C-alpha cells in the first residue's frame, strides 16, 4: 500500500534545502551596501590597474581539453563507489560498469581521431 506520510522527511528536506539559498540571497540583497562608483565598475587584477580590455577569447581547444577532463572526472566519481562494493554487487553490475568504460574509451578514441586532443 502506498502511504504518502512516509515521505514527510523528504518533503521537509526539500523545503528546507530550497529555503536556505533563497533566504541567503534575500538577506544579502537587503544587507549589502549599494555603491556604483568607478571602482565597482572596473575589473580587478591583483591590485594592479588593468591595461587594455578585460575580455579575451579563448581557443576552442581549451574547452575540448576541459570537457574531456570533466568526462573522466565524472567517470572516477561513478567507478570509485562501484569498485569499493564490487564483491557485493555481482557480475551484472560489472558488465554495466564495463559497458560504461567501453563507451568512454570509444569516445576518447573518437576525440583523438578527430584531432580534439592536439594542442597546436
Curated annotation (Swiss-Prot):
Record GO biological process: photosynthesis, light reaction
Keywords: Chloroplast, Membrane, NAD, NADP, Plastid, Plastoquinone, Quinone, Thylakoid, Translocase, Transmembrane, Transmembrane helix, Transport
Pfam families cross-referenced by the UniProt entry: Oxidored_q4
Coarse class of the protein's main subcellular location: plastid
Topology versus the membrane: Multi-pass membrane protein
Keyword Transport attributed: yes
Coiled coil: none
Localization: Plastid, Chloroplast thylakoid membrane
Annotated family: Belongs to the complex I subunit 3 family.
Role noted for this protein: NDH shuttles electrons from NAD(P)H:plastoquinone, via FMN and iron-sulfur (Fe-S) centers, to quinones in the photosynthetic chain and possibly in a chloroplast respiratory chain. The immediate electron acceptor for the enzyme in this species is believed to be plastoquinone. Couples the redox reaction to proton translocation, and thus conserves the redox energy in a proton gradient.
Protein name: NAD(P)H-quinone oxidoreductase subunit 3, chloroplastic
The organism of origin for this protein: Phaseolus vulgaris (Kidney bean)
Amino acid at each position: 500500500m502506498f502511504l504518502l506520510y512516509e515521505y514527510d522527511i523528504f518533503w521537509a528536506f526539500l523545503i528546507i534545502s530550497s529555503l536556505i539559498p533563497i533566504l541567503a540571497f534575500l538577506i544579502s540583497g537587503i544587507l549589502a551596501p549599494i555603491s556604483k562608483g568607478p571602482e565597482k565598475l572596473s575589473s580587478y587584477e591583483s591590485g594592479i590597474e588593468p591595461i587594455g580590455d578585460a575580455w579575451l577569447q579563448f581557443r576552442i581547444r581549451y574547452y575540448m581539453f576541459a570537457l574531456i577532463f570533466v568526462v573522466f572526472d565524472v567517470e572516477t566519481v561513478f567507478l570509485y563507489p562501484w569498485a569499493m562494493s564490487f564483491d557485493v554487487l555481482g557480475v551484472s553490475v560489472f558488465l554495466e560498469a564495463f559497458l560504461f568504460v567501453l563507451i568512454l574509451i570509444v569516445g576518447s578514441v573518437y576525440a583523438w581521431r578527430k584531432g580534439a586532443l592536439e594542442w597546436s
